[in-house]
Structure formats: C-alpha cells, structure tokens
C-alpha cells in the first residue's frame, strides 16, 4: 500500500479504534475460530477481495480475519453514514487500503467503490464481498457500458447520475477495465436481503456472469442478524438520535419479515405500543398472533409517534402519509436503501439539521417531522449497528463463503446459491460455548429413526426455522 492508498476521516483515531477492536474480538468467537482453524492452511492465499460493507468495528474484525487466512483486501463502506471513523483508521493503520468516511457524499461513495478495485499492481480483484450489491453492480454495469455507452445516458435519480459519472470516469481513465475485472471474478458473497434480490434479478435476466453466495439466507444470518440484531440496534439508534421516551409511544413498523420482527420486538420491549403494516397475509397473520395490531398505513399514519420501515421496497412511507402524522413524528429506516421513505419528495421543504444524521423538516402548515439518517439505515447512521456477537455469526458465514468461492469455484454455477447446511450448523456451533450452551447428542438409533447422522446436518434444506 502506498502512503496515500486509503481515505479515512483521521488516521490519528487508529489507537482508539484498535482498543474497541480488541474488545470486539472477545465477542466474535466464530471469526476467531476461523483464524485458529485456517491460519496454517491459508486457504485465501492469492485472494484479492474487494469488500463493500459497513466499515464498523465488527467489520474490522472480519477484515483482519480474512487477512489472517491469506487474503489481500481493499475496502469501502456500503452506506454513506455507516462508517465508524475510528474503525476505518485502525484498519488503514495496519496497511489495508480502506476508503470510508462517516458522512461521505454520494459522489465520494462511488469514488471509494471504484478505489476498492484499483490494486497498485494493476491486476484485478478475484472476489467481491458485498452488501447491497453496489460493488457488484458497479462492475457489471460498467462492463455493459463498455459495449453500449447509451445505457448511461438516462439516469433516473441523482444517485444514479453520480453512479453513471463514476463509470464514465473509469472508462475514460482505463479502457476495458470493467470487462477485464468482470472476467477475473471467481464469485461474490452478498450480505443483505436487498442485495440478494438484485442478484436474483440479474440471474433471471441472464446477466450474472459468476457464482454468488447468498449470505442473507443462511439461517445463522437471517434468523439472528436480521432479527436479534435489529432487536437491539433499532431502539439504540432512536434513543441516541432523539433522546425521546419510547415507552407509551405509538410506533408503526412497516414490514414483518425477519427485520420487521426484530424491530417490532425492539420497540415493544422499550414499552411502545406497536402496530405493523404488511402486504403478505402470512406475515400479517404472524404479526397478529405475536400480539401486534396489523393496520394499513393510509389509515394509521395519523396515530404514529414513530414510523420505521423494514421492507427493502420503495415508497413505503409516501409524502401523503407524512402529511398525516403527528407533529414531531420520528421517521426512520432499517431496511436498506433511502427510498423506503420518500425523502426526495421532502427536498423543497425547509430542513433544520439538529445534529449529525438528525433533521427536522417543516411542512407549510407548521407540522414538523424528525428524519433519521436521511432515510438511510438509522441503526448504523445514528448508532453503531448490531452487537459484535450477532455479527460474528453473519461474518463467519462470509469467511466460509469466500473460502468456498476461492478454493472451489468450479463447484458453483453462475447463479445465486446458499452455503450448504453443514456450514450453517458449523457457524452456530462455533457460538455455543460463549453462551454456555450444552447440546444433547443423538444416539445412533435416534439418528437412524429420523434419517440423519449424530453429527448432522439435522434438518433438510427446506426446513423453516
């Protein structure tokens, strides 16, 4: 790494970041077990990983785990507000190129994603570790643009305009870059629901040129990170942002998937009266039987003190909903992108910045709303994201996926797949001792009776946990 091969807020924060990183390691047994298991064999020796995932303390432990088992890594954050600057500094100080600043502009965001593919020797990356599929989309859209520039001519949003401009800059600076980079990729591992959806769309359209491992639908990710992580980090973000008393407030959670379930539990545990909106009759019935009132936002918006979106879809909270809410209603998103709330529809109204990632927006009738993290992930923008322990499970999946893709790339087709069940169970097993969990062991007779081995896997792939 050259002296300039990183962009962080302040490299002097490295010592502070290192102290927190050391603490996080004690709460991330899965990642530490990976270091112990694979440090000798170095299965990622020769891997050149371009990582785009929230640059937090927990991600720093992931990065150092990948490096400890042989990988070379370049990193950016997957959200303009999610970087923890001391974490980025701690990683940069070790010689790992990292490009991440809390509060970076959208233009900088795409510049930093480009930077994770710019290795000093000029050779391409061979793996992508992604969150939201932005890094993957950058390479694939760029390679398409190298054969047809017209696809960059009509951006639909401000962010897409900046995205296209970055592609154009790279095409001019390095002709053929995207096509060469696409051809070198052995595979990608994707962290989130939103990113997995994008990858499935690419596969459906015949535009996925390499294998993709869906981390999100590993049981030890979706049923833990998405649910239990949100259960802790949502209320943390709201409290740090607003200092409001949540108990007694009426909160509406839009969506009751795994993230919605965790979010509803988070608010309910803080004493809020929680209502849920849903499009899916199965999830709606689950919410009702968990004790929540299931409502339509058109009807219920006026009752809300807090509205949280969790869906991964767009236009969930529209301008007409925001006109109905109570004065000083808190709006936040814990889904993925900033279009779950129609933030663009608010741009012509007066904004007052209260503090970083907290804005008050005033309507013509004098009503005010509090918007958290400009509609982006509030648990990372207004707080520090999920706790280390639950992220250890998610990130252990990432490490195992990167090893699979690098060492067994011929085993996977150019499609979206999940890690095999035995690895999912391995991830869970690595986290049991930390919580003092003692497993019961099947006898040979019991195992034969249900058609498994005493060592597992214990459930068929179609089992729903």
Curated annotation (Swiss-Prot):
Entry-linked InterPro entries: Adenosylhomocyst_ase-like_sf, Adenosylhomocysteinase-like, Ado_hCys_hydrolase_NAD-bd, NAD(P)-bd_dom_sf, S-Ado-L-homoCys_hydrolase_CS
Cofactor comment text: Binds 1 NAD(+) per subunit.
Pathway: Amino-acid biosynthesis; L-homocysteine biosynthesis; L-homocysteine from S-adenosyl-L-homocysteine: step 1/1
Necessary cofactors: NAD(+)
Protein EC: 3.13.2.1
Top-level taxon in the UniProt lineage: Bacteria
GO biological process entries: L-homocysteine biosynthetic process; one-carbon metabolic process; S-adenosylmethionine cycle
Subcellular localization, as worded in the UniProt entry: Cytoplasm
Binding, NAD(+): 192-194, 226, 255-260, 278, 313, 334-336, 379
UniProt xrefs under PROSITE patterns: ADOHCYASE_1 (PS00738), ADOHCYASE_2 (PS00739)
One Gene Ontology term of the molecular function aspect: adenosylhomocysteinase activity
GO CC annotation terms, alphabetical: cytosol
Enzymatic class: hydrolase
Protein's UniProt keywords contain Lipoprotein: no
Reaction catalyzed: S-adenosyl-L-homocysteine + H2O = L-homocysteine + adenosine
Residues engaged in binding substrate: 56, 131, 191, 221, 225
One Pfam short name: AdoHcyase
Alphabetical keyword list: Cytoplasm, Hydrolase, NAD, One-carbon metabolism
Functional summary from the UniProt entry: May play a key role in the regulation of the intracellular concentration of adenosylhomocysteine.
NCBIfam families for this protein: ahcY (TIGR00936), PRK05476.2-3 (NF004005)
PANTHER family tied to this protein: ADENOSYLHOMOCYSTEINASE
Family: Belongs to the adenosylhomocysteinase family.
Protein name, as recorded: Adenosylhomocysteinase
Taxonomic source organism: Bartonella henselae (strain ATCC 49882 / DSM 28221 / CCUG 30454 / Houston 1) (Rochalimaea henselae)
């Amino acid at each position: 790494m050259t002296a300039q091969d990183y962009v962080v807020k302040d490299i002097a924060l490295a010592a502070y970041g290192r102290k927190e990183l050391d603490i996080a390691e004690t709460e991330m047994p899965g990642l530490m077990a990976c270091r112990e298991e694979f440090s000798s064999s170095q299965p990622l020796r020769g891997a050149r990983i371009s990582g785009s995932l929230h640059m937090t303390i927990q991600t720093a432990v992931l990065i150092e785990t990948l490096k400890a088992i042989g990988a070379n890594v370049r990193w950016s954050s997957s959200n303009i507000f999610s970087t923890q600057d001391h974490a980025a500094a701690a990683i940069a100080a070790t010689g790992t190129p990292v490009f991440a600043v809390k509060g970076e502009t959208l233009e900088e965001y795409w510049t930093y994603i480009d930077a994770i593919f710019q290795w000093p020797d000029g050779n391409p990356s061979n793996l992508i570790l992604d969150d939201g599929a932005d890094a993957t989309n950058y390479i694939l859209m760029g390679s398409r643009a190298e054969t047809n520039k017209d696809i960059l001519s009509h951006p639909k949003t401000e962010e897409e305009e900046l995205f296209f401009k970055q592609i154009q800059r790279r095409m001019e600076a390095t002709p053929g870059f995207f096509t060469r980079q696409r051809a070198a990729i052995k595979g990608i591992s994707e962290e989130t629901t939103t990113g997995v959806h994008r990858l499935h769309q690419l596969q459906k359209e015949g535009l996925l040129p390499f294998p993709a491992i869906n981390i999100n639908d590993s049981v030890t990710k979706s049923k833990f990170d998405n649910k239990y992580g949100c259960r802790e980090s949502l209320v943390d973000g709201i409290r740090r942002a607003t200092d409001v008393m949540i108990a007694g407030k009426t909160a509406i959670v839009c969506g009751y998937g795994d993230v919605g379930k965790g979010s509803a539990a988070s608010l309910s545990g803080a004493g809020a009266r929680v209502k849920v909106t849903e499009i899916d009759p199965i999830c709606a019935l689950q919410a009702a039987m968990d004790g929540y009132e299931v409502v339509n936002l058109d009807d219920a918006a006026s009752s809300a003190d807090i509205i949280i979106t969790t869906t991964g879809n767009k236009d969930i909270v529209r301008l007409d909903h925001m006109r109905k809410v109570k004065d000083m209603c808190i709006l936040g998103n814990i889904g993925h992108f900033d279009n779950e709330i129609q933030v663009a529809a608010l741009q012509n109204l007066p904004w007052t910045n209260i503090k970083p990632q907290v804005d008050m927006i005033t309507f013509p009738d004098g009503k005010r709303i509090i918007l958290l993290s400009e509609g982006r992930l509030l648990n990372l923008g207004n707080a520090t994201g999920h706790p280390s322990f639950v992220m250890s499970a998610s990130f252990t999946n990432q490490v195992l996926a990167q090893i699979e893709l690098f060492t067994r790339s011929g085993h996977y087709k150019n499609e979206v797949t999940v890690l095999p069940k035995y690895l999912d169970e391995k991830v869970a097993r690595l986290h049991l001792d930390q919580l003092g969990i003692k497993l019961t062991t099947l006898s040979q007779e019991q195992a034969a009776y249900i058609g498994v081995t005493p060592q597992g896997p214990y459930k068929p792939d179609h089992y729903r946990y």
